[in-house]
Amino acid sequence: MASSSNTMEFEEDDSTVTQTSLPTTTSVLDKSRSLFGNSAVISTPARDSTPDGHIVDSSVITKSSVIIEAEDEPDVAADVTALDKEKAEDEPQCSAGKDAKSGESMNDSEKSESPIEEGEGETFEKKIISMDTSDDKLDIAESISVSNDTEKPEENEEKVVGDEDEEDIDDVQEDDEDEAPKKKTKKAVSTSDDDDLHEDDSPKGGSVSDEKEEPENEDDTEEPENEVEVESPVKEQADSGEPIENVNDDKASEPGVGEISQDSVDDSQKIGLDSKSPDGESEANEENQESQSSSRSTRRAKRVSATVSSTPSSNTPRRGGRGQKSEVNADETKTPIVSNSTPRRGRSSRGGDRDEVIDPTENVVGDSGVEETSPRKGRSRRSVATEDTSVTEEVENTEHPTEEETPKQGRGRRSAASSSATSSAVPTPRSTRGRGRKSQANEENLQEKETEDPTKTHDTNQAKSTRTPRGRRSNADAETMESVEAEKVETPTSSRRSTRAKPPAKSAPVTPAVTNKRTTVRGRKKQGSITEDPIEEADETIEETLPQKKGRGAAKSAPSSSKKSAEYDPYDLDTEMEHHPEPLKNIHMEVHNFGAVKYAKLGNSESKYSMTEKAAESRIAELQSSPAAKNRRSLADMTPGKDKMKHRVSSVGTSGRRSRAKKEEEHHENDIEMEDAPATATPASSNRGRKRKSEASDIKTPPAKKEPVIPLKNLSDEDQLLVDHPQDDNEPHAPGARVYAVFQKMFYPAVVLSERDGLGRYKVQFTVDNVIKDVPNSGIIPLRALSPGKTAVYNESDVRLDSGPNDISAAEWKKGKLTISIMDEDGEPTDEVKVVDWYDVSFDHSEWRDYVKSKDQSATAIVTSNITTISEATRARKPTTVSNQAKPKGRKKKGVDLVSSRGGSASPAEEEEKLLPMNEEAIGKNIFTGKVFMLTSANRSNSASVPSMFKKKNLMNFITQNGGIVTEQLNSFQERYSNYEPLLISDTYYRTHKYLAALARGVPCVNNTWLQACGEQGKCVDYTDYVLPAGASIFDESQDMPAPKNPSELLKGTTIYVHSTHSAREVTQTGPGGTFIEIWKPILELLGADVVDGDWETLDETGLKFDVVLVDGTFRDEVMEYADTIGASRVTSEWVIQTIILGKAPEPNAHPKFDPYRLHHRTRH
């Protein structure tokens, strides 16, 4: 009351100003005053005058009654106007929206009467004054004034919009929203708009009543937050001015009057009941103030008006005309979304083709308060557009006097929609999509949640009062109600409660919640974000039940929402299964070391060991020896997240289980990392999956090693000859070489596919079945190694090999023809001779045992094994001298004739195994004094076939203990030990550098058995019978050639040029070896040849002369051409070796191996 008195004083000041400026408005205000002062009386005759029982008719009748009163009773109207002015001044102070509405009403009256137009212009001045004086008011009045400030520009904008087209409404709304903070500019615009609107006669009268009543609807006690938040919707109303005015022409005027009356009644009940004066004028003033505030609220957010629903008893008489709007105002305080937004939204949805303004006629007819609340749809411009379209249809049917009210209502609807959107926690997009039942249900749920306690107390009272408007709404437009409720998603329940007409005293506390929501309404996104998350699930579950409740009274909606809220359980597995983790069924927990816990999902199999059985089955399938390897599935296929190998499973049931498990894994993906080890062979485990993945990679390597069938290389005749006949027999086999590889104690024809690997094995492919296998060097017999007299197998019968392929001709060699003789039952060769292909014959392992043994003991090629130059042997061992001290006598105690020549702690048995026997009498005699020995690398200690006493280490110890000297340096024979007799000890002849160098020097090569004989006899015996041959002739491999007697005379008088571009040194056991030139140049000099040096690039310039050029595979063609020009022979190292073996120099072209161009390792430049 104190606040109202203050406003009255301020209003009096304003009224004085306005009275001086507005003489004509006084009559209009008197008319409105008569209407507002005798609100109950006016509403009653209005309903009586309206033959239609509808709210629209009642509202229209009230307007008509007001107009009639203004015409018939000008004096009374004048008196009323004075009071109205005072209250109008008071109301703008409390709420700026009230002045805006009064200005619009003045404009409406001016449309009917020209003098009213001037008054309306002055009403805008009053508004300005109220805006300025709003600072002196109480906090509540200040909040209302803030809303009034926003409403004033909104009214101006509405009027401007009335002049503009409906399409411009959206643009004007946006501009108004931008101008909202600028109050002065908006006020000026509003005054100019009001002047324009004064020109319209008929709509002004209705608008005047509406404006006055709407401010009455706004409660001075309503929270300022709501009003402030309402500003954006008010701007939207201003934007939709023109189409709204058209709506006012038809129906907006009528609903505006009805709404004003009802708002005034409601406000009077809320605030006016306390501050009612005995005079109807005071009540009218209070009602006018409330109506103005309510209109402001409706413009900004008509939720507040809807929530402030008046008590059903006091508002019942006015519901016919104005009481309904008062209900709307009451609803606006809380949540007018359902009632107001429903008709507008339904109308907008129904009349999608209509103008921007929503149907004010039907909505007003059904329930003017509902219409105002429907602006909540104004949340989104979409809803505004729908409202505008519906209003345009109504404009066609409506009369001009109601034009201004409808725009206010339209904008108010927008504001109300926005406020309702904010108030309701339900997401905006869903409500708008659901345009109907779903949104209603969501709104109901939200309303119940927000106002469960306060609303429950008022539900009974509201149910009575609101049922009537709800029925009217359904009668007017059930579909519109549903659609409006859908858009108002968040506040439908509050609006319904407001329609039920809760007591005004209680509606005021409800408004703060609504206002907070209104603020969020401006940010529709904010509103959606707040409400969507908690209520999405509830909306989905309630969608089906909502359509049934939407059509009926609000009484059902509130209990339904409470019921649903009570039923809603976020932990309910039935309703929240999609948002819930997978139920812990078939989950097995295992506790491992260090407290580690693993979870595994068991399969459908009942067996406890189903997982182990499947794992074992898949692993067995990958074994090479398993015949079902191709029909099994590897563990790699079972690992998740990896492309599975396309192994087909023989069992159909297993594949079905596998597919189901896969689907379950895809469907049930949990944040918890669980180990899925079903019997379906598709585990989803993370840890165990990784282990299986690594294990599977190891398991599936054997099948991966099965190389695809590689066709035999089709080499030319020359290339095939070079591959099959390398420069040195000890050189590695080249790819494409034709060989016989061992397989299960038999040698079968095969072709070498790749170079030797790190383990010394060759990858060969058998020609019979194209199987690829890795075979060591000792398991390969080259085709060139075939010798006559060997027994072979041909067509499962034994035959004797007479001759191999002819290597003189490359074409003949490429054919690979073998000559064999058929053997009889006794194993004797017959006269039957056949010529067969090399791949039709196989050999038994027993026939080549000696060859394999020699391969195991043989050294590597001359270019890679034990080849060191005199200058490069840096790691040569120093010769050791044997002490002449006698051995301990204790060694003779066992009475063994053979004693170890080396003292040590080893047992006699071990000494007998490691050391050569030495005659007891010869111990200490140093039988090898004056001799220097060199041991070849062929006697290697790691050779399993060599007896321990013939191992190189033991031989060295035996020699040194008996007075001999062991050296590794080739030059020691002549330089350091020129006075010693040199000997080379070996078990057989070799093609190593040491052996060939010893032959070139004329050093006797003695068998190691000679040392054994010396030890047994206790003296140094003659080694003549133990001298080894020089080697096998290339022309006759069956004959071993003796060592040359005069090696220094073999190449005497021959000038040789050694050429090679390979500068890398070979690494040997004794250290770095020499290059091709460093190896062969000393040997050629020992053989008596004259070796010339020269740069191969300057041979033409220098004109170097030589007889023979010795090259390796890296020779340059320029050197070959130069040799041809000077008539020099071109030979390989094989020519030098054969010279040493044969004891004479063969012809350079006597054998293909002497031709440099046939070297298989030749580097093409």
Curated annotation (Swiss-Prot):
Residues 98-114, 123-140, 149-162, 397-408, 446-461, 662-671, 694-708 have a biased composition (Basic and acidic residues). Disruption phenotype: Reduced number of apoptotic cells following gamma-irradiation. In a rad-54 knockdown but not in brc-1 mutant background, restores levels of embryonic survival and chromosomal aberrations in oocytes following gamma-irradiation to almost wildtype. Mutants show slightly reduced levels of egl-1 mRNA expression. Disulfide bonds: none annotated. Gene3D superfamilies: BRCT domain. Expressed in germ cells. Residues 1-26, 70-578, 608-713, 874-913 are annotated as: Disordered. The keyword Nucleus applies. Residues 16-26, 415-431, 554-563 have a biased composition (Low complexity). It is found in: Nucleus. CDD domains: BRCT_p53bp1_rpt1, BRCT_p53bp1_rpt2. It comes from the Eukaryota. GO terms for molecular function: histone binding. One of its GO terms (cellular component) is nucleus. Induction: Induced by DNA damage cues including gamma-irradiation, and UV and hydroxyurea treatment. GO terms for biological process: DNA damage checkpoint signaling; DNA repair; positive regulation of transcription by RNA polymerase II. Residues 163-179, 211-230, 280-289, 533-543 have a biased composition (Acidic residues). Residues 923-1028 form the BRCT domain. Residues 306-317 have a biased composition (Polar residues). Keywords: DNA damage, DNA repair, Nucleus. Signal peptide: none annotated. May have a role in DNA double-strand break repair following gamma-irradiation. This is Protein hsr-9. It comes from Caenorhabditis elegans. The lineage of its organism: Eukaryota, Metazoa, Ecdysozoa, Nematoda, Chromadorea.
